[in-house]
Structure formats: structure tokens, C-alpha cells
UniProtKB/Swiss-Prot annotation:
Pfam families: DUF188
Source taxonomy: Bacteria, Pseudomonadati, Pseudomonadota, Gammaproteobacteria, Alteromonadales
Similarity remark: Belongs to the UPF0178 family.
Record protein name field: UPF0178 protein swp_1285
InterPro entries in the record: UPF0178
Length: 152
């Protein structure tokens, strides 16, 4: 399992959690973004910079992803592609996207896009809470533990 990070919009606290997990579990973690992201020195953490453009980083993640890999993203259409390709998708707030929930999440996203297009002010997401940070760390740990057990 590799961990792919949609790093363009990934919160700093999430990246810090990922960096610690990569070194602790010795899991290859690759950040993909259209700008350089500072990463700590580690043999398990890499940065890939792609050209600017709509969904260029997302497309690169999907291209490189193999079944069983984990993608960290808040981008719901990207999460749907990851699941379709046999990967796992986790958002920075600790919500695991699955075959069972991705369609309803996509539908809600599309509904909110329609509302915004018609002039309704929907606001953005709230700042990440401590409980969401903890939920992410816990879910990441569960996924890594499960992978390590299957690998034995």
C-alpha cells in the first residue's frame, strides 16, 4: 500500500499526521500538488509537482494509483475515481469514502453546487476541530494496521 496525498488543499495538520505515520509505519507516502510542498527528510515521503491546471494533480494520482492504495483527499469526484479503481479514499476530517457512501456524498456535493449556482450562499466548511483531527489520525492508524496485518 502506498499513501497518495492530494496535497494542493490538504491541511497542514493532516500532512503532519501523515508524515509521522509514514515514518512510524514505514509506508511510502507521496504528496502530489501543482506547487512545491515542504516535506521533512524521510526515505518514506516524496513530493511530486505537476503542472498547473484543472484536475492535473487528481489525474496524476489516479494514473499512479494501484488497487489497495490509500488516497487522502477532500475532493469527492477524485475519491469516487479512487474507489472505482480499487483504492481507498479518506478525507482529512477522518471520513472514509466507500462504495456504499460515495454516491450519496457525490449527490449532496452536486446539489450544493446547484444551490450555489442559483445564488444561495452555502458557506464553506468549518475549520477542522480537534475531534476531526483525531478521527483522521485514528482512521489512518486503523487502515495502516489492517494493511500491515494483511501483508504478514
Amino acid at each position: 500500500m502506498k499513501v497518495w496525498v492530494d496535497a494542493d488543499a490538504c491541511p497542514g495538520v493532516t500532512k503532519e499526521t501523515l508524515f509521522r505515520a509514514a515514518d512510524r509505519a514505514e509506508i511510502e507516502t507521496i504528496l502530489i500538488a501543482n506547487h512545491s510542498v515542504r516535506i521533512p527528510p524521510s526515505r518514506f515521503i516524496k513530493m511530486v509537482t505537476v503542472s498547473s491546471g484543472f484536475d492535473v494533480a487528481d489525474d496524476e494520482i489516479v494514473k499512479r494509483l494501484t488497487a489497495g492504495d490509500l488516497v487522502i483527499t477532500a475532493d469527492i469526484p477524485l475519491a469516487a475515481e479512487v474507489i472505482e479503481k480499487g483504492g481507498l479514499a479518506l478525507n482529512p476530517r477522518g471520513e472514509l469514502y466507500t462504495e456504499q457512501n460515495i454516491k450519496s456524498i457525490l449527490n449532496m456535493r452536486d446539489f450544493m453546487d446547484t444551490m450555489r449556482a442559483s445564488g444561495v450562499q452555502t458557506g464553506g466548511p468549518a475549520a477542522m476541530s480537534q475531534s476531526e483531527r483525531q478521527a483522521f489520525a485514528n482512521q489512518l492508524d486503523r487502515l495502516i494496521t489492517k494493511f500491515k496485518q494483511q501483508k504478514k
